[in-house]
């Protein structure tokens, strides 16, 4: 087990199972998910059947990138610098924009609900609230577009 000076965060992965990870790893895991979401967003953008969803996916990619950058920088201001090899995207299995945005929503809500309550994390919580707002905005925009189901 990795020793840490910081408290550990409980992540509920299911009703029966709880996994203990360090606060640092909690944030790194989510930043890795965001990295994977950026890759999936670009793949869906390139395979878009129509221009409308193509454009919205490109716009949403910028939203994800800006959010990830903000969270990563805030994390380092609180918990210290991360090593240059810790970010590795977690692969998304979504094959269309609707499934993708729902996957992003679920992961982000889970992250938000487990952010530590210490005052130093209020900026991350606030940024995540704005990101959740953007997720619902783009969910609506994706729903009114032509998408391809695989």
Regions found by a protein language model. Name each.
Residues 1-26, 123-126, 149-150:
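Charge-dense, intrinsically disordered terminal/linker segments
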Residues 16-31, 37, 97-100, 104:
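Disorder-to-helix initiation segments
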Residues 31, 38, 45, 61, ...:
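Heptad-repeat amphipathic alpha-helical coiled-coil interaction surface used
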Residues 36-59, 81, 114-122:
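Helix-loop segments that flank and shape redox-cofactor active sites
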Residues 52-83:
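Conserved alpha-helical segments that form or flank metal/cofactor-binding pockets of metalloenzymes
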Residues 77-78, 122, 141-150:
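Long amphipathic alpha-helical segments
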Residues 87-142:
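Acidic/histidine-rich alpha-helical segments that form the ligand environment
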């Amino acid at each position: 087990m990795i020793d840490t000076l910081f408290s550990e965060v409980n992540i509920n992965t299911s009703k029966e199972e709880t996994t203990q990870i360090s606060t640092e790893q909690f944030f790194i895991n989510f930043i890795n998910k965001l990295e994977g979401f950026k890759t999936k967003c670009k793949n869906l953008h390139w395979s878009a059947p129509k221009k409308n969803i193509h454009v919205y996916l490109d716009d949403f990619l910028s939203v994800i990138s800006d959010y990830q950058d903000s969270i990563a920088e805030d994390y380092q201001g609180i918990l210290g610098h991360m090593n240059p090899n810790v970010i590795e995207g977690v692969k998304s299995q979504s094959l269309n924009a609707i499934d993708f945005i729902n996957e992003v929503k679920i992961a982000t809500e889970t992250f938000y609900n487990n952010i530590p309550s210490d005052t130093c994390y209020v900026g991350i919580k606030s940024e995540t609230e704005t990101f959740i707002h953007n997720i619902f905005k783009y969910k609506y925009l994706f729903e009114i577009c032509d998408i391809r189901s695989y």
